[in-house]
Amino acid sequence: MRFVLCCTLIALAALSVKAFGHHPGNRDTVEVKNRKYNAASSESSYLNKDNDSISAGAHRAKSVEQSQDKSKYTSGPEGVSYSGRSQNYKDSKQAYADYHSDPNGGSASAGQSRDSSLRERNVHYVSDGEAVAASSDARDENRSAQQNAQANWNADGSYGVSADRSGSASSRRRQANYYSDKDITAASKDDSRADSSRRSNAYYNRDSDGSESAGLSDRSASSSKNDNVFVYRTKDSIGGQAKSSRSSHSQESDAYYNSSPDGSYNAGTRDSSISNKKKASSTIYADKDQIRAANDRSSSKQLKQSSAQISSGPEGTSVSSKDRQYSNDKRSKSDAYVGRDGTVAYSNKDSEKTSRQSNTNYADQNSVRSDSAASDQTSKSYDRGYSDKNIVAHSSGSRGSQNQKSSSYRADKDGFSSSTNTEKSKFSSSNSVVETSDGASASRESSAEDTKSSNSNVQSDEKSASQSSSSRSSQESASYSSSSSSSTLSEDSSEVDIDLGNLGWWWNSDNKVQRAAGGATKSGASSSTQATTVSGADDSADSYTWWWNPRRSSSSSSSASSSSSGSNVGGSSQSSGSSTSGSNARGHLGTVSSTGSTSNTDSSSKSAGSRTSGGSSTYGYSSSHRGGSVSSTGSSSNTDSSTKNAGSSTSGGSSTYGYSSSHRGGSVSSTGSSSNTDSSTKSAGSSTSGGSSTYGYSSRHRGGRVSSTGSSSTTDASSNSVGSSTSGGSSTYGYSSNSRDGSVSSTGSSSNTDSNSNSAGSSTSGGSSTYGYSSNSRDGSVSSTGSSSNTDSNSNSAGSSTSGGSSTYGYSSNSRDGSVSSTGSSSNTDASTDLTGSSTSGGSSTYGYSSDSRDGSVSSTGSSSNTDASTDLAGSSTSGGSSTYGYSSDCGDGSVSSTGSSSNTDASTDLAGSSTSGGSSTYGYSSDSRDGSVSSTGSSSNTDASTDLAGSSTSGGSSTYGYSSNSRDGSVSSTGSSSNTDASTDLTGSSTSGGSSTYGYSSSNRDGSVLATGSSSNTDASTTEESTTSAGSSTEGYSSSSHDGSVTSTDGSSTSGGASSSSASTAKSDAASSEDGFWWWNRRKSGSGHKSATVQSSTTDKTSTDSASSTDSTSSTSGASTTTSGSSSTSGGSSTSDASSTSSSVSRSHHSGVNRLLHKPGQGKICLCFENIFDIPYHLRKNIGV
């Protein structure tokens, strides 16, 4: 090791050669030796040299330090080599060095170790002249660490490097490798830690063809994580994949992307979670011609499954979706297709729901038993649509069946007992088909089957009185209507085919006569005062009107009223309703308004009677028109009063349809209202009334909106005997597909009230369901609101009440700048007095889905309120309110939706008075929003029932405000509903007042609309003294500087029904007025706009056995651009002797419509409608050749 010592020895050897000279015969050989010894150390060295080689060595030892050094050097023809060793036994140190070289290369190595610290290091180097290899290693036993490194340089220019480090103390190991030549590069890195059970590695490869690949993975056993990423690239394509899993949460996710040389690509994601039982996957594939995407989701926890697919190619775009929910056994699927040029489109929607339900109650204290079972409640519905350049076809249908059984038994210690058994079986089916081309056809089918059986028994030992009743009814109905129309125009024909029946004639400026196919009107009534049966009151009214190619506007109004009265003898009365159809095809800047009103009144006194009356249906169609609007309003009012004997009343509801396809800048508004009132006194009666259904459809429209509103109100009051009341709910559907800058708003409201006094009764009422769908909509919004209110009041006897809830669904897929808002509200109230009662009420469920939405928001609110109060003394007051606020952040072009619901119920009996008041206020604000919407809904329901003493006062109101400023392509929708019911019996008077006010404001909006709807319903039933009922509804809608917009204000429907018997007199008045007709003429900066106002009022009062009744009803409507029709029907009947009265009134406003049409600026064609050919003015008849 001591190079200085070696050099010294070599120098001494050279000097000795010169000093001593050459020995004879051995002149090229030199040998030198040196030795030195003492007690502490010893040294020795030598040098040998001959002609070709030299060798030298040295050795040194120290006994005190316990160390020694050795070195050896050799040089000759084979090369040069050197080795050295050093040892220190005292400190346990060792070191070595070796070196060798020859003509072909060489090698070297060195190392040291320390046994005291257990450390060791080594270095190696080898070369063969072309290739070089080097390595090093280190070891530390104290820290359990080890380190290795290696490098290679090859003759071809390639090289590689690797390193390895490990430490048992930190339980960590790291490895790195790198290799490169002129074509290939590879690198990898690996890191593992045993203490945290974690391992990660990464790699990179580049091949000779230029392709690259890289990846990394991370695994952790402690946190149960595993992540992997892989990417690759070639000269033609790229791709990648990422996987992640967490076994602690039982989660897995996967994403991939691949592209092909032809430019196509596919990508997808997969997610699954076993902990919350969810799975989701999405795939997308695209090439130069088409793109396909699919989305699948499932939740085994919520028992839900959904899938959606979209495909877009050169021919067009198709969309399909499927939903399945196993918890309530519900299925739905939809398909839609739109051609690339927009000429061919179709859509299919199917839904199915099955539910089973049973309930059993038992109480030992009062021996109360009640059980009910509803099984196999199945409903199916479908919707089909098709359109091309020439044809617009639409068909829809629904099918439902229901079986229901209920029974109750009650007894107390005083001997009073009552039992009730009811069985129901329902079946219904409906179908609707619309087809439009050069001709048009519309057909509607419906079938209904209703079977009911009820048995009631009451016994009381205290009064030794017993009463039993049994009733069974079976009802079947089927209806079918079909209409078709075609129009033929001839330029030079001078002969006109004329049918002198009840036909309408149209006159235009080109002196052409077009025939409008119409129906006949038939009415008949018969009454008898003899001791025989009164039957045969059959009233019907049908009218159809069709228009073709109108340039400006058209209006149709039809009204039918039928009355039948039979007195003093048992009788039956049947009356059918009225149907009105209006169709408009290819109208520019036109307006279609269709209004149908039906009023039926039946009064039978002092004997048993049964009555069945059909509802009212209204259709309005519009296709391919620009800048126009379609408004259709249907109203049905049915009233049945039977006194002093058993009677049953069944009345059908009201259905309204509005269709619009391929229109720009327009609006579709349809409103259906149904009101049914049944009053039976002093004997057993049953009342069944159907609900109200409203449909609104819109496809491929820009800048427009679809609004549909359905309202159903049913009231049954029976006194002094057993009665049962069943009422159906309200369903509303709104569909919108591929709409831009549009909105879909649908509102359904159902209110049912049943009041039974002094005997056992049962009430069952269905809920309300609302659906709103929107797919592929941009800058649109979907808003759906369902409200259901059910009230049952039983006094002095046993009763059971069961009411269904409310369900609301809103779906939105692939929407940009859109929003989904769904609101469900359910309120159920049961008040039974003097005896134990049971109340069962369903809740409220709300669903909102949004997928792949940008800058959107989803808001869903559900509210359910149930109250049961049974009292024997004093009074109770209950009041509650609900306020709800919804916020959305980080959304641009979004929406704010807030919903409030308040329900208050008070029931007091036998003493004192009670006062209940409740209100609901809801506010939604949106400022500076683009393509957004503000939707706010308030609902208030108040119910008061007081019996036998004093007076009660109930007042409730609902106020709703919605503001939107500086919104483009937006909409403001606000809806207020107020329902108040008061039932007081046997003493004094009661006063009930309720109102609803709704405000909607919109300023500086383009393609927007303002919609405000108010509905108020008040019902009062008193047996003695006087009762006063007043109801009002006020609605205001404002719009300024709107283009292609529409303002619709509907002062909905106001219904007041009163029934009083046994004494005194009753006076009722109801008035509804709307004054906004001339606003049309005062508007500025409005293009293709429309405002429609419709008021309907129906008032009916029945008084029997004594005194007189007076009824007053007024309706005033002033509206402008198109004909606005108001229909008022008033029927009053009082029977104290053998007398019968029948009244029928039909009013149409012809001349007012004619005047407005004549004075409207820019009118291209004038349309006049006449019932009889002789009503045509002489100069007109002369011009058309009549």
From Swiss-Prot:
Biased composition (Polar residues): 39-48, 104-115, 256-275, 356-380, 393-409, 416-445
Note: The glue-like property of sericin is attributed to the hydrogen bonding between serine residues of sericin with serine residues in the fibroin structural components of silk fiber.
Listed Basic residues bias regions: 1148-1157
Predominant location: secreted
Any Gene Ontology CC annotation: extracellular region
The keyword Oxidoreductase is assigned to this record: no
Name this polypeptide is given: Sericin 1
Classification of source organism: Eukaryota, Metazoa, Ecdysozoa, Arthropoda, Hexapoda
Protein task: Provides the silk fibroin thread with a sticky coating. Acts as a cement by sticking silk threads together.
Superkingdom, natural source: Eukaryota
Sequence repeats: 593-630, 631-668, 669-706, 707-744, 745-782, 783-820, 821-858, 859-896, 897-934, 935-972, 973-1010
Expressing tissues: Produced exclusively in the middle (MSG) section of silk glands.
Subcellular location(s) of the protein: Secreted
Keyword annotations from UniProtKB, A to Z: Repeat, Secreted, Signal, Silk protein
Biased composition range(s): Low complexity: 145-155, 211-224, 300-312, 465-491, 518-537, 553-698, 705-1004, 1015-1075, 1097-1145
Glycosyltransferase listed as a keyword: no
Annotated region (Disordered), positions in chain: 39-119, 131-494, 518-1157
Signal sequence, start to end: 1-21
Bias (Basic and acidic residues): 180-198, 286-299, 321-334
